[in-house]
A protein has these predicted regions:
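Short loop/turn motifs at secondary-structure junctions and domain boundaries
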Residues: 42-47
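Long, compositionally biased intrinsically disordered regions
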Residues: 192-324
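Extended, well-ordered protein cores
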Residues: 10-15
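Extended, Lys/Arg-enriched charged tracts that mediate electrostatic binding to polyanionic substrates
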Residues: 19-41
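Generic detector of solvent-exposed, compositionally biased contiguous segments
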Residues: 16-18, 123
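Short, small-residue-biased leader/transition segments that mark boundaries at the very start
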Residues: 2-5
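Acyl-donor binding region in acyl/amide transferases
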Residues: 26, 30, 48-50, 56-200
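General structural signal for secondary-structure boundaries
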Residues: 28, 35-37, 151, 182-187, ...
Length: 324
């Protein structure tokens, strides 16, 4: 099922495509994703992690990559949607962790993404019962909430995930009052330096440990430099870093369960199917939903001679006009 390049044959019509979800080993998944993605891809992921590749079965080509993981703690639109903050009680915290998952990587290969609305297909696949069952089996979950955020921030009035009801629904804008995370060797070097000086300062089993480590180091640095010219310079740097982040559009899926909020918040553990929408979340129905949209897209591009034929892999040697 593997191929030399993670691409799709751009000459095939959407009506002829068939897909398979494949859970790849981490090393293989990382290699493929780094070929097509411009962002920094994390290899060490705390908490739950499901790495998937989507295979187009006729051409035996990979058309996209997905990584699902444990959700972030702070999410204002989620709190508003659920009618409360899950961290307020141990019961709600346990229920949330048992039922919720977040999409961190939803990246189509190119030109599949452009020619066939590949991003919408991958996002919809994340909302499928088949994905939910994979998570339930792997982590003994009772999955009923999938969430993700838009690629672009609030400077964009729309997102690639708009127009995806009932699979994905827009639920509001995230808060943007946070500092971009440090990754890779700079982060590890800084953490090691501080731990060598004062010992381990965030428990090994703490949730969102990397964020807590980063915020604690910033707080200690501010305290140590308080009242000094260096402290003023550091505070200004932090303020500038805060201005780099934008509010993101937050999207959620309930997998076709009408009482998902009560289950996520621990008020009950019995899921109730929405008779109008539940079946729409089966993978076969999701693919057919996508196929109609992709057919319109593909045939329009063909008619206007705008089909992209070039395989896009991230080498740094040429300019790509799609951030992913």
């Amino acid at each position: 099922q593997t191929c030399a390049l993670p691409i799709c044959d751009f000459t095939i019509h959407p009506k002829d495509m068939e897909f398979e979800l494949v859970e790849l080993p981490q090393d293989t998944w990382d290699i493929y994703l780094n070929m097509i993605s411009s962002h920094s891809n994390m290899t060490s992921i705390p908490g739950r992690c499901l790495r998937l590749a989507v295979l187009e079965k006729k051409t035996k080509k990979w058309v996209g990559f997905i990584r699902l993981g444990s959700p972030v703690i702070n999410m204002k639109p989620r709190n508003e949607m659920l009618g409360g903050v899950f961290t307020q009680t141990p019961e709600a915290s346990k229920a949330f962790n048992h039922t919720s998952i977040m999409g961190f990587v939803i990246v189509p290969s190119q030109p599949f993404g452009y020619n066939y609305l590949g991003g919408k297909l991958l996002a919809a696949i994340c909302c499928s019962h088949e994905i939910r069952e994979m998570l339930n089996k792997k982590y003994k979950m009772n999955t009923c909430l999938f969430e993700t955020t838009s690629l672009y921030g609030s400077s964009k009035s729309s997102s690639q995930y708009d127009g995806m009801k009932p699979m994905l629904r827009f639920k509001g804008l995230t808060d943007s009052n946070f500092i971009p995370m440090m990754h890779g060797k700079p982060y590890e070097d800084l953490k090691t330096y501080v731990e060598n000086a004062i010992g381990v300062f965030v428990p090994e089993d703490a949730s969102s440990r990397k964020m807590k480590i980063s915020n604690t180091i910033i707080a200690m640095t501010k305290a140590a430099l308080k009242g000094t010219p260096e402290g003023e310079k550091f505070n200004k740097t932090i303020q500038n870093a805060l201005s780099l982040t934008e509010k993101k559009r937050y999207y959620a899926s309930n997998y076709g369960f009408s009482n998902f909020a009560d289950v996520v918040m621990g008020r009950t553990d019995k899921l109730v199917k929405d008779p109008e929408n539940y079946d729409k979340f089966h993978l076969a129905n999701i693919v057919e939903w996508w196929r109609k949209k992709a057919t319109n897209r593909f045939e329009t591009l063909v008619a206007e001679n705008r089909i992209r034929n070039e395989i896009e892999v991230w080498t740094g040697e040429k300019e790509l006009d799609i951030i992913r």
